[in-house]
Amino acid sequence: MDTKLLDILACPITKGPLKLSADKTELISKGAGLAYPIRDGIPVMLESEARTLTDDERLDK
């Protein structure tokens, strides 16, 4: 994922920042408690495609 793109993307729910997951397969929105998938290098920013973060993931800094 291009870091410049990551800098301008925001969570569609909270409008807050997103963080790239450690394995670089998801964009994490702590505010919404969601992880948006990245497929073929393209972030899928749909709430219906996102997974809910686990309690442990929500607590990670």
Curated annotation (Swiss-Prot):
Pfam families: Trm112p
CC per GO annotation: cytosol
Similarity remark: Belongs to the UPF0434 family.
Protein's UniProt name: UPF0434 protein PP_1901
Source organism of the structure: Pseudomonas putida (strain ATCC 47054 / DSM 6125 / CFBP 8728 / NCIMB 11950 / KT2440)
